Amino acid sequence: MSEVVIVGAARTPIGAFLGGLAPLAAPKLGAIAIRAALERSGIPLDTIDEVYMGNVVQAGVGQAPARQAALGAGLPQSVPCTTVNKVCGSGLKSVMLASSQILAGEARCIVAGGMESMSNAPYLARGLRSGLSLGEHVIEDANLVDGLVDAYGGGHMGLGGEKAAECCSLTREDQDRFAVRSYEKALAAQRSGAFDDEIVTVDVPGRKGVVTTVAKDETPRETSLDALAKLAPAFKPGGTVTAGNASKLNDGAAALVVASAERARELRAAPLARLIAQGQYAREPELFLLAPSGAIRRVLERAGWTIGSVDLFEVNEAFSGIEGVRRELGIPEERFNVNGGAVALGHPIGASGARLLVTLLYALRARGKRRGIVSLCLGGGEAVALAVEAT
């Protein structure tokens, strides 16, 4: 069976909600990430067999978002494309699907990633098609309906963050401390240039021909325990989840070039990493935030690894309650989200899985480390995980 390798990886900066990347639709951001990943791989465009791109909030994005991104990146019209919606796991699931296709012999070289523009999510007015009756009517936010509200219990994902914190006995201070560390690590990474190699700058056209360049993640900022302690609970009275210790609404994209080892050799493309194992896990929807524990355990078993043998973990910080997963698995703090996570950097939901993988690859290389695992929880009670080994 062929090995699967990653030969190119890039991401856009993560834009703040209604921030610098807001003028660009998700497929535009996806095209930029795809183009950069391909350029870094050195692989000719006509050698790509297929494209998978994650995208969650698709209302108003237009037909076939992945196809839009691929053609926007300059890929030939002969390349088939698939849009993946597995909520926050979409970007990583795209890479997992690419790996499976290659192992099955259905393709030899695939672009996979994710993209999201939460700034451009529309509002939904139900009932207009058939005519509204007398009385008040609700306009719904597509970010909430399609991305951030539990389809089963009807509660915001933040209530799942509350539930996870309760299950893991995490106090408000525990979560605020976790958030402060995330901000500190993200700011340190920015200042040291740790993100520079993985990010492709984005030129955003504006009025009267003015072009604005976005070159770094927009949401990391200075904060403190005292500052976070002043914030009110965001999702329930007396709760522990706040705007300061939760992830943000964001825009961004990430892409990777995935190939069989044989195809990479044929194309003289230098692998960044080998894909070792992948796994998924599902449990009660309201405990989605804790699902990465199960997914990571499955990947460890399939890879024949232990927690102690893994150099770096990138686990999505949808909420600071993800600290419960770190504690449950016994992951050392110094190996966990070493450059900060979504609490500080942001969470463009369809892109985050690919973004975490890109960040993991560059972090392994910068530190001279080999083994890494990336994992994300996702709405509905699931999680995805992937193990890689740097080459």
Annotate each language-model stretch with its function:
Residues A10-T12, P23-L24, L29-I32, D174-E266, ...:
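N-terminal extracellular/periplasmic Venus flytrap/periplasmic-binding protein-like
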Residues K86-E116, A165-A194, A255-E262, R326, ...:
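Active-site-proximal alpha-helical scaffold in enzymes
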Residues C109-K163, C167:
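Flexible glycine-/small-residue-enriched beta->alpha junction loops
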Residues M1-V61, P65-A73, Q77-P80, G160-R172, ...:
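Conserved active-site "lid/cap" helical segment
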Residues M1-A26, A36, L225-L290, G294-R302, ...:
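Condensing-enzyme catalytic core mediating Claisen C-C bond formation in acyl metabolism
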Residues G160-E162, E198, G206, I276-A344:
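Active-site pocket-lining segment
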Residues N55-C109, A151-L159, E222-K248, R327-R355, ...:
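Conserved catalytic cysteine-centered active-site region
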